[in-house]
Amino acid sequence: MNETNDNDIDQLIYLFSKLPGLGIRSARRIALYLLQDKDVRLKSLINNLVEIDKKIVKCEICGNMDTENICRICSSEYRDKSIIAIVETVAELWAMERSGNFKGLYHVFGHNLSAASRQNPSILRLPELLTRCFAENIKEVIIATNSTLEGQTTAYFITEYLKEHPAKISRLASGIPIGGELDYLDDGTVSAAINLRQPFE
């Protein structure tokens, strides 16, 4: 095998190793699995990724990922449209959906605030959130940011920003450890946190 091919395979392994939860050893196994039957496995993966890239878009309302400009959650007539949960990323939205215990709407920030990195609060899409709260007559805002320092910082900033809106503001409750991230918790823990949410002050 020539040097160019070696470099190409190394690049493939490197790309896989950058995926969440994968290290170099796992990346090597995946690359080898695909390359051993590339006409079926690798081409199938490539074709599916191309199709996903064409079809998946960000919801214009909440920031969720879907195949429609307005996602299935926002367009559903069965959701409680008086409650909105604020999450950092789509991963946290999926975690709450898996719990089967939240029937409201979502607002995905896509980021959190870090005092250390001095991020601009404009990354949080707060004006859009406030507009939604007034336009959709939201009665309760659940702050479902992670229990990390950044998540807590973001939660306090949201609370201050929403002071002009009369909605009740609550925070996910017991079951989420300090420093814990929502996406890594089991479904029962997420469900308990939703049920036992508390006013956020």
Curated annotation (Swiss-Prot):
Question: Would the keyword Hydrolase turn up in this protein's UniProt record?
Answer: no
Mark the transmembrane ranges. none
SUPFAM superfamilies xref list: Recombination protein RecR
- Which molecular function GO terms apply here? DNA binding; zinc ion binding
Q: Zn fingers (C4-type): where?
A: 59-74
* InterPro entries in the cross-refs: DNA_Rcmb_RecR, Rcmb_RecR, Rcmb_RecR_Znf, TOPRIM_dom, TOPRIM_RecR
Tell me the ranges covered by the Toprim domain, including all copies: 82-177
Keyword annotations for this protein?
Answer: DNA damage, DNA recombination, DNA repair, Metal-binding, Zinc, Zinc-finger
Q: Which GO terms describe its biological process?
A: DNA recombination; DNA repair
**Protein family according to the UniProt entry:** Belongs to the RecR family.
Q: What does this protein do?
A: May play a role in DNA repair. It seems to be involved in an RecBC-independent recombinational process of DNA repair. It may act with RecF and RecO.
Q: What is this protein called?
A: Recombination protein RecR
Q: Which organism is it from?
A: Rickettsia peacockii (strain Rustic)
